Amino acid sequence: MAQAVLLAGCGDLGLRVAERLLARGLEVWALRRHPPSAAPAAIRWIAADLADPASLAGLPRHIDRVAYLPAPGGRDPDRYRAVFVDGPRHLLAALGPQPRRWVFVSSSAVYGEHGGQWIDEDTPTAPQGFNGRLLLQAEQWLQANLPGAVVLRLAGLYGPGRSQLLQRLREGQARAAAGHWANRIHIDDAAAAVDHLLHLPAPLPCYLGADDTPMPLDQLYGALARLLQAPPPAPGPAPAQVGSKRMSNRRLKASGLALRWPDSLAGYRDLIERGMV
């Protein structure tokens, strides 16, 4: 019998993880409040809400691995708490101790302001916003209750269909703070990282998911504007509650993951040239 993996929350990132798991020949279950009509037929969908424990009754009992990667469905603290703090508790109660690996997809929002310095998994956390505080609370609870759980703290995702930034640049509406360092990872590399950590023997408790090229926002936006043949972005304030930092991916790469898109500008260029954004 094929090993079974549950994707708890299965949006754009989850679907890309699912494709990799299916290619391994695994049995893939995906939990979502409203399963999509267009998705790989081999995915076994579960219509449920992580914030509603009653909806999780009857989950399959033979799940071997879990990737927890939902979208919050809103930018308010109550929804974040329901999905990221309460959700793992509900899911663990529903599944029991059977899964031998959990990967919790978190965010670099758990870090505070670092003045553009390099950070890694051992850098102290000091989240500035409610999202980072609640994600950190969820990480700590999960690792206290599942000592083998693995946390993946992702940088900002970009990739096909994620065109908001490029659209703002085209329209001359983007603003960039000089000297404010930002980090990116292609969504396909993020999916590869989740798949990798689901199967990595003896993983460490935490990994940062970012590419090799953190850049100040004004330099990144300026380079993207040139690729788009758009006007350079005007100066603007730093993003609210997003500290300036450079994320080190050394631990993730040392574990054996090879990034397809280590340079975000090369990744953006490919998307623009292929008309995918």
Locate predicted features:
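NAD(P)-cofactor binding segment of oxidoreductase domains
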Residues: 59-103, 137
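C-terminal amphipathic/interface module of NAD(P)-dependent oxidoreductases
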Residues: 240-277
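Substrate-positioning beta->alpha
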Residues: 157, 164-167, 176-198
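Conserved Rossmann-fold cofactor-binding substructure of NAD(P)-dependent oxidoreductases
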Residues: 43-64
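Catalytic helix-loop patch of NAD(P)-dependent Rossmann-fold dehydrogenases
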Residues: 115-151
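N-terminal Rossmann-fold NAD(P) dinucleotide-binding loop
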Residues: 14-15
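Conserved Rossmann-fold NAD(P)-dependent oxidoreductase catalytic core, especially the SDR/UDP-sugar
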Residues: 89-128
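Mid/C-terminal beta-alpha module of Rossmann-like enzyme folds, strongest
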Residues: 191-243
